């Protein structure tokens, strides 16, 4: 490959700060020249009719000779394309639009000197509109034979290294516009994310669920065990909380008669940031009357199967070099059975012995144990520390303790456990669902238990929500509900190691100046 000149920024290395400043000055000078010539530097009159990917697909299998024969018969395929200049080699230019890349062919003998000069002055990152007709090179590459070309936007900063994009991961997150511009993998990831969300919506609508919107700011945080973000409403002079989950509002809609509802939106939790957690995240929550948690496990299997098949073409995927099958049925395992399988040197005969559980959690697992923790809380800690990370294939863990499931219905067979499940894939939780607690007296007692934990210092415990108890008293039909983390699902389907790779603008620590 020939090495372009400096003025077109095509250097194999990232420019040093002084070089970058020089390039910025050169780009600004070019813009000044355009303005001085009387041209509109940012015109908005070009109308695109064609996309790169569509043209590549339309001419797949059509040879160079066939295209030339059509040209000779006066049957040229006229197109109007637009995009960002990614390569300018004089005879050929490569532009990129939202669907992909396509070449532009510069026929020097057919273009006037002014047009050739304009083409020569193009820099990487400039945005152009091109009218011309389709051709194919001797190497088989499809191109647009330029008849007219117009500069639509002049780039005033040099692009990142065109061969390696943004090498620094943090720089990619902070400058997602540059990452998308130069990194095909990043663009593909967010195209899949869009397909996942639209696919979920299509699936739910086909299942006769109704899409709804509920408040993002709550007077009382609820619907999950988590620490909320707090704000203040000046006009009402009251604290408000960014929602940690939409659950309680959605169940009030079921009380009102909307028997199958779902919402896709953000929730917020004022907790740690990691490869699995972002303070602002996207989830779907849905509720179905006259269903139980078994029905939702079946629905979840169908949903995951359909998404993988429609988007990836298969249910057999690879995540971080590990083969995972999303084909139904998924593994189903109770929490106690998971502890028996994965907790080393654990005496299952003492699974309900609080003293033994506390000793195992604190001594063997090195976990902090508080006096307020009951048997169910300790069982959950032991499960999370010993089993969770080992659940590689899709696995529904069922029969969670009532103590750690304040909104879930108690099991008819054992009131100490609930009709609840969580779905784990690749050692990570992707979904949480249960048959809903619709007994208002039991719900009030569980809220009081959460209040006791909060008073004992648990910042993540729930508040007592009297309005929800009142709504529940009007009668919630037998109902099952579930939440699925869309960010983690996209991580799985795109083989992304970090949640930051699948969120366009993840939260970052403020960049220090200087």
Swiss-Prot record:
> Which coenzymes or cofactors are required?
Mg(2+)
Q: Cite the CDD domains for this sequence.
A: LysRS_core, LysRS_N
Name a single GO biological process: lysyl-tRNA aminoacylation
Q: What GO molecular function annotations does the UniProt record carry, in alphabetical order?
A: ATP binding; lysine-tRNA ligase activity; magnesium ion binding; tRNA binding
* GO CC terms: cytosol
* Free-text comment on the cofactor: Binds 3 Mg(2+) ions per subunit.
EC numbers listed for it are: 6.1.1.6
Bias class Low complexity marks the residues at: 1-13
| Binding site residues for Mg(2+) 1 | 422, 429
Q: Where is this region: Disordered?
A: 1-21
Q: What is this protein called in UniProt?
A: Lysine--tRNA ligase
Q: What is the lineage of its organism?
A: Bacteria, Pseudomonadati, Pseudomonadota, Gammaproteobacteria, Moraxellales
What gene is this protein a product of? Answer: lysS
